[in-house]
Amino acid sequence: MTDMKIDRRQMLKLEAAAIAAAAAGMPSTSLAANLVTEREASELKWDKAACRFCGTGCSVMVATKDNRVVATHGDIKAEVNRGLNCVKGYFLSKIMYGHDRLTHPMLRKTNGKYDKNGEFTPVSWDEAFDIMALKFKDALKKRGPSGVGMFGSGQWTIWEGYAASKLFKAGFRTNNIDPNARHCMASAVAGMMRTFGIDEPAGCYDDIEAADAFVLWGSNMAEMHPILWTRVTDRRLSAPHVKVAVLSTFEHRSFDLADIGMVFKPQTDLYLLNAIANHIIKTGRVNKDFVQAHTVFKKGQTDIGYGLRPEHPLQKKATGAAKANDATDISFDEYAKFVSDYTLEKAAEMSGVPLNRLEALAELYADPKTKVVSFWTMGFNQHTRGVWCNNLVYNIHLLTGKIAEAGNSPFSLTGQPSACGTAREVGTFSHRLPADMVVTNKEHRTKAEHIWQLPEGTIPDKPGYHAVLQSRMLKDGLLNAYWVQVNNNLQAGPNANEETYPGFRNPDNFIVVSDAYPSVTALAADLILPTAMWVEKEGAYGNAERRTQFWHQLVSAPGEARSDLWQLMEFSKRFKIEEVWPEELIAKKPDVRGKTLFDVLYKNGQVDKFPLDQIEAGYANDESKAFGFYVHKGLFEEYAAFGRGHGHDLAPFEAYHKERGLRWPVVDGKETRWRFREGSDPYVKAGTGVQFYGFPDGKARIFALPYEPPAESPDKDYPFWLSTGRVVEHWHSGTMTRRVPELYKAFPEAVCFMHPDDAQEANLRRGDEVKVASRRGFIRARVETRGRDKPPRGLVFVPWFDESKLINKVTLDATDPISLQTDYKKCAVRIERV
């Protein structure tokens, strides 16, 4: 072993880093284990990559040896995490090496032939694509473009999502493609679009070091964004005047730092938000100059339903469901009158939060001297009125002018590593195109068709099936060929018993799942395709602060596993244009006759124009080698054409391999920290100060939106609220983290967190097994009354990482009618001893 000498200065740095690491859930000994990053000293090759897990976008240093990742540590050159990792990030080196890693395509067969009820049998890629192409062509003949679909991911790399969107929206001419970001970020997208006319946060992580107060709305940052939480903690502990307010339906680890901790009754966040706005108006703290110059007022459509099936009684009663996204102009006076009924006193009574705490919270926003950052995640977004929650928190920041400047920021935190970069920016949602364009807008479709070199009318003008609707259509037999990549929706989707699983096993359907491991979803499929993971391919993610980050391929995938990008592009070779486009469309561009979708979409003179010698020396690139050109650069530069000059500018391709990410818009080589603010955002006109240029009038919208009840509430038969969510040790459905021994042992199985008094009343003790049952299904779990999560009486919390306890058999598939995002935080259950 090579001797190392560490001087006093280095030792002090290590001690400081160890303290911060402990706050992130990482054992202090882990830091010393990964200190040596020079190849000469360690005989390892080190390179940078974006972390595979959450939307924080930490950069990590990855060590490889003999075609294997052997170590990782936080990247000290990264602005985001400054050398730190959370407990999941610390074990990144192990996520690719589970004992049951998939290495060959697997097709259900009986007696050598495909059989929906057969056993999984290894097959070649050719055989896998043959049966897959046959089933897709059958579905296209039977139902047209609506018969095929795809469910993708906020964990796709940017070019994987872009290639998938092209294949389905342009190739198969269907918008039936949606990412699992529909479950996590759709309400944030719709909220931004409604308020600002353009997507993604105005601020950045630099706001943390400039803020005087932090307000968390439905966000357990301590566990879900632990590295950002270390920065919030550092700010709070190093500046005595700084305050932290945390609002949630149950107490969790973020409450440990809270100066103002508030547990509110589910759904009453709507009431609280309006009450704060009313307080600002009543106490004369509206920033009148800002409001007059930069905002207009709207009254939103109400009684919009809950996104349930049309025959559901709640949908039948919803008078505004058909026009859920509509709004009409009102004046400031009309808005002030609307919120005047929402007093802090009534809010306290409605929510159960003590009045003095609500007053303290309202004053953080109202005091013009206090800079406030509002953070929120799934508590807001997974909500039947999630878009409204987003709009209402923007209202507060707009009324006070606390936006688009250092320390003043309403900030929706992203859950997945590229929910922003791939789902939102690339536009892999069923209604979107790149750079905030939508399929319903003819000008947007025309621009996309021009960049993609397609005949006019190629892209359909109606949104496709969104995530929840895909499950319903599969069940109903109206969506027959379906491809799932980089997600585990049978475990993650709501109401799994009634709405998700039936579609997978419908004999009329053919289900393909691309995954690295045999997940619950993969095991319910007809064909499993083995997938390359993380640094087994060249990649790019976009994080929550608009930061785009690249990494090189560092190792090869095992066996016959191939990247999702390779799968998409290789599969496209199986389709002649005549098999997927109507004759009248082909007639508009006759030179496509006889070509494959691969030729038209990916070997089109744009994507394939960069030769292999442009790949940086010393790095493998399996996808590019397979196709004969630098795939990633070609896809990226074509995609970047959508945003350049339109407020979504990306830097040249090579810049991202050199940098630890850049925050768009990147104009003349300079990234943007604060959008909409003159001097920071190059799109703001000189002399305007602030310009919300997403709308032609340059103004943001302030919405009058009421409290409306949840889709389902506790009653005598089902007396408890159920909320679901995550824990720091596991990522989403646990497909990766449960295969890391240290993370599995740290939290081996999901439990039912319950108030001790509720348990005592039911004659239950900690560790007893109970049935958590709703009107839709049940699971068994053990009671936890002394854990990190502390629900109030009448509410239980069950995390969803555990495939042996599929809590989404219990949840309700109600969605926000505007964003179409599922509410996983509120349904009614009963707790029974087993």
Curated annotation (Swiss-Prot):
Superkingdom assignment: Bacteria
Any single biological process term in GO: cellular respiration
Positions contributing to substrate binding: W800
Protein localization: Periplasm
A GO CC annotation given for this chain: periplasmic space
Cofactor(s) the record lists: [4Fe-4S] cluster; Mo-bis(molybdopterin guanine dinucleotide)
UniProt-listed Pfam families: Molybdop_Fe4S4, Molybdopterin, Molydop_binding
Modifications after synthesis and translation: Predicted to be exported by the Tat system. The position of the signal peptide cleavage has not been experimentally proven.
Residues annotated as binding Mo-bis(molybdopterin guanine dinucleotide): 88, 155, 180, 184, 217-224, 248-252, 267-269, 378, 382, 488, 514-515, 537, 564, 724-733, 808, 825
Single annotated GO MF: 4 iron, 4 sulfur cluster binding
Keywords assigned by UniProt, alphabetized: 4Fe-4S, Electron transport, Iron, Iron-sulfur, Metal-binding, Molybdenum, Nitrate assimilation, Oxidoreductase, Periplasm, Signal, Transport
Catalytic activity of the protein: 2 Fe(II)-[cytochrome] + nitrate + 2 H(+) = 2 Fe(III)-[cytochrome] + nitrite + H2O
Gene3D superfamilies the UniProt entry points to: 2.40.40.20, 3.30.200.210, 3.40.50.740, Dimethylsulfoxide Reductase, domain 2 (3.40.228.10)
Enzyme Commission no: 1.9.6.1
Matching InterPro entries: Asp_de-COase-like_dom_sf, CT_Nitrate-R-NapA-like, MoPterin_dinucl-bd_dom, Mopterin_OxRdtase, Mopterin_OxRdtase_4Fe-4S_dom, MopterinOxRdtase_cofactor_BS, Periplasm_NO3_reductase_lsu, Prok_molybdopt-oxidoreductase
Binding site for [4Fe-4S] cluster: C51, C54, C58, C86
SUPFAM superfamilies named among the record's database cross-references: ADC-like (SSF50692), Formate dehydrogenase/DMSO reductase, domains 1-3 (SSF53706)
Protein function: Catalytic subunit of the periplasmic nitrate reductase complex NapAB. Receives electrons from NapB and catalyzes the reduction of nitrate to nitrite.
Family under the similarity heading: Belongs to the prokaryotic molybdopterin-containing oxidoreductase family. NasA/NapA/NarB subfamily.
PANTHER family documented for this protein: PERIPLASMIC NITRATE REDUCTASE, RESPIRATORY NITRATE REDUCTASE
Subunit-level organization: Component of the periplasmic nitrate reductase NapAB complex composed of NapA and NapB.
Name of protein: Periplasmic nitrate reductase
Source species of the chain: Bradyrhizobium sp. (strain BTAi1 / ATCC BAA-1182)
Source species taxonomy: Bacteria, Pseudomonadati, Pseudomonadota, Alphaproteobacteria, Hyphomicrobiales
Gene this protein is translated from: napA
